[in-house]
Amino acid sequence: MIRQRTLKEIVKTTGVGLHSGRKVTLTLRPAAANTGIIYRRTDVNPPVDFPADPASVRDTMLCTALVNDEGVRISTVEHLNAALAGMGIDNIIVEVDAPEIPIMDGSASPFVYLLQQAGIETQNVPKRFIRIKKPVRFEDGDKWAEFVPFNGFRMDFEIEFNHPAIESDEQRLLFDFSSQGFVREISRARTFGFMRDIEYLQSQNLVLGGSFDNAIVLDDYRILNEEGLRFDNEFVTHKLLDAIGDLYMCGHAIIGEFRAFKSGHGLNNQLLRAVLADQEAWEWTTFEEEEGSPVAFAQPNMVLA
């Protein structure tokens, strides 16, 4: 059968918080089968847990943030959550000693590396997938996102930026999900922002940790980073990476096709909530044979370059 996965060992790293600009220590811990993905704040007493759940997402202004009823929050979870999706991790405790996950280089790649350092442990319990049974769509003005039935996890994502540095023919991306494809084609895409927005936000004591080290920065005409882009379609690829992380807030791999136009964290979350709220739109499924899985996850001992 296709089994649930956790980590073999505890791993730890430090980075900078995007919004606070302060040092953050991140610890990833193995968890028992059926635990799910738990985000934990250890700098509050007692520590506060946030299960990965679309209902925990209560702020999507500049990132995906988990907020509880007392207003305690963990921000910027989407890139790490995308890495967990990419590596097929079902059960994990994610600890931070700050109100946010460190931004690292603005992509999911450092988190993939961290998970590979920890190693993947398979557990003797079936992995539960969410299979989409009928189309579900959510719209917001000219923006929209939808799920339709498909025997795999396919993504069709389009952005629309009228900017000289963002090529018009590099604003749509189709991706058939696999661990290998995620690591090689998606995980290294960095977040991006406009210098005028960053300057304004920093004047409001936001994105104090934002820099050329963790984002693609543009002015009105060009990319300001000396090294340029990692690949030609890095902008749309990062938006697709964000969507992978946002959709994995349900804690389970999805079998279906995700299509989106100009979608962001809020719309991704609204679609996920709409799907799960409709009992006829989805069903649980497991697989007795690895070969029968419509979603290809890396072998636990395989290191993906």
Curated annotation (Swiss-Prot):
Belongs to the LpxC family. Pathway: Glycolipid biosynthesis; lipid IV(A) biosynthesis; lipid IV(A) from (3R)-3-hydroxytetradecanoyl-[acyl-carrier-protein] and UDP-N-acetyl-alpha-D-glucosamine: step 2/6. Zn(2+) binds at H79, H238, D242. It is an enzyme of class 3 (hydrolase). Catalyzes the hydrolysis of UDP-3-O-myristoyl-N-acetylglucosamine to form UDP-3-O-myristoylglucosamine and acetate, the committed step in lipid A biosynthesis. Transmembrane segments: none annotated. GO terms for molecular function: metal ion binding; UDP-3-O-acyl-N-acetylglucosamine deacetylase activity. Its cofactor is Zn(2+). GO terms for cellular component: membrane. Its EC number is 3.5.1.108. It catalyses: a UDP-3-O-[(3R)-3-hydroxyacyl]-N-acetyl-alpha-D-glucosamine + H2O = a UDP-3-O-[(3R)-3-hydroxyacyl]-alpha-D-glucosamine + acetate. The active site is at H265. It comes from Vibrio campbellii (strain ATCC BAA-1116). The keyword Chloroplast does not apply. GO terms for biological process: lipid A biosynthetic process. It comes from the Bacteria. Keywords: Hydrolase, Lipid A biosynthesis, Lipid biosynthesis, Lipid metabolism, Metal-binding, Zinc. This is UDP-3-O-acyl-N-acetylglucosamine deacetylase.
